[in-house]
Regions:
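Residue(s) in the substrate-gating loop at a strand-loop-helix junction
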Residues: 133
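Catalytic Tyr-X3-Lys loop
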Residues: 91-110, 153
């Protein structure tokens, strides 16, 4: 049996990942999302606000109780949940939205990695896939919190991978930028004004020209590479630069 813990499964990439995982009878899916509505057949769902560290710890306690005593061949954590707001210049950003962005996009994945590594100790194959963004690797006006959080997630992944290697732990960690996906988050971005988000017209053109990838296609690519063990290697990677046949950067 394989264990998959996935966050942000209400919609978008997280939903697509969860549905694909749950289709395989060899997988046990544990979904963490802000809403348990629309349950995924074959999966267990836990409702939690990832911005609330105490609530997240309680949810992890429930997950740990669920999996305690079970034997898994493989355990995979997918930190997918994310928020882009506030979309605004830093001096115009809402303080609460700034704090929530960092909490959901950076603090929550780190807390989940911590608990995942502890609760899956002894599982032969352990993998952490942190869904990052190209925004963590270059500055984008209007996205100060999102860029900072994703850059932090990349570095947290590097450190986690280094610690696993130096301590002889068999854990693969990758912070993966999946490319631009056709999701609700993209819709919110396109609704911003040019004053809030200088690149808004470029994002609107991508939608109009059909260059956004469907979430289901991206999810299938990620899971195919993961199942083949081809996301191992560099702890910070871009799905668009990975050759689907070899898992090696082009």
């Amino acid at each position: 049996m394989n264990l998959y813990i996935v966050t942000g499964t209400t919609q978008g990439l997280g939903r697509a990942l969860a549905e694909l995982i749950a289709r395989d009878a060899a997988n046990e899916l544990v979904a963490l999302a802000r809403s348990a509505e629309g349950p995924i057949p074959g999966g267990a769902a836990f409702e939690v606000d990832l911005a609330d560290a105490a609530a997240l710890e309680r949810a992890c306690d429930r997950v740990e109780a669920r999996i305690r005593g079970k034997r898994y061949e493989k355990a995979v954590l997918v930190n997918n949940a994310g928020v882009v707001a506030p979309v605004a210049p830093l001096d115009a950003a809402d303080p609460g939205e700034l704090a929530r962005n960092i909490a959901v996009n950076l603090t929550a994945p780190m807390l989940l990695m911590r608990r995942f590594l502890r609760m899956t100790e002894g599982v032969a194959i352990r993998r952490v896939i942190n869904i990052s963004s190209g925004a963590g690797r270059r500055p984008i006006s209007g996205w100060s919190a999102y860029c900072a959080a994703k850059a932090g997630l990349d570095m947290a992944s590097r450190v986690a991978a280094l610690e696993a290697q130096s301590r002889g732990h068999a854990v693969e960690v990758v912070s993966l930028a999946p490319g631009v996906i056709d999701t609700g988050m993209q819709g919110a971005v396109r609704g911003a004004s040019p004053e809030q988000f200088a690149d808004v017209e470029r994002f609107r053109r991508m939608k109009a020209e059909g260059t956004l990838r469907p979430a289901a296609d991206v999810a299938a690519d990620i899971l195919r590479l993961e199942a083949a063990g081809r996301l191992a290697g560099e702890p910070v990677a871009d799905l668009r630069e990975l050759d689907a046949g070899t898992g090696i950067r082009a």
